[in-house]
A protein has these predicted regions:
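Primarily extracytoplasmic/secreted proteins
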Residues: 1-170
């Protein structure tokens, strides 16, 4: 809830990974709320069991109240630390993405190509939870390569899970 109003799910992935990477059925999701609230706004909710993180972006100046495109992706390659998520983007639009992978060393080592800003946190020497924003997008398909870069203690040393969700607005 944001300001007492429930947010709407745009994109979500919560299925177990296969192919030899860590098979955790962890959730990565993007929710949104169109609001006229200003100033301090309370955000409440229950993250469920285990490690939970909520990142919040405020985006303004866009015409679409609902996403024009959404996508999810998951790494199942047991020789890879990265995964690309692709979605249809509009000229001068905005993409918000969410990702979860195993933790990095040093902390905060995840990168996302084509993003303007990334926010991330490593928790309990186990998982990295991150989000990115890409404003001023081009018309067409935009690819976001999400890379763990510096693995810390991956359950499978040669790969990592990447649980990715993204939504785009114009």
């Amino acid at each position: 809830n944001i300001g007492g109003v429930g947010a709407t799910l745009a994109a979500k992935i919560d299925t177990s990974a296969t192919g030899g990477v860590w098979g955790g059925a962890v959730t990565s999701a993007v929710y949104y709320l169109v609001t006229s609230a200003s100033g301090s706004t309370q955000i409440t909710g229950n993250g469920g069991s285990g490690r939970s993180v909520a990142h919040v972006w405020e985006i303004t100046g866009y015409n679409s109240s609902t996403p024009t495109a959404t996508a999810t992706a998951q790494n199942t390659d047991n020789t890879s630390f990265s995964k690309t998520i692709s979605l249809s983007t509009q000229y001068n639009g905005c993409t918000i993405g969410s990702g979860m992978t195993e933790d990095t060393s040093p902390a905060g080592s995840v990168t996302v190509s084509n993003s303007d800003q990334i926010v991330q946190i490593d928790l309990e020497s186990a998982t990295n939870h991150y989000t990115w924003k890409d404003e001023g997008t081009s018309l067409g398909t935009t690819n976001y390569l999400c890379n763990q870069n510096n693995p810390a203690s991956n359950l499978n040393a040669g790969s990592t899970i990447q649980q990715l969700a993204a939504a785009h607005w114009k």
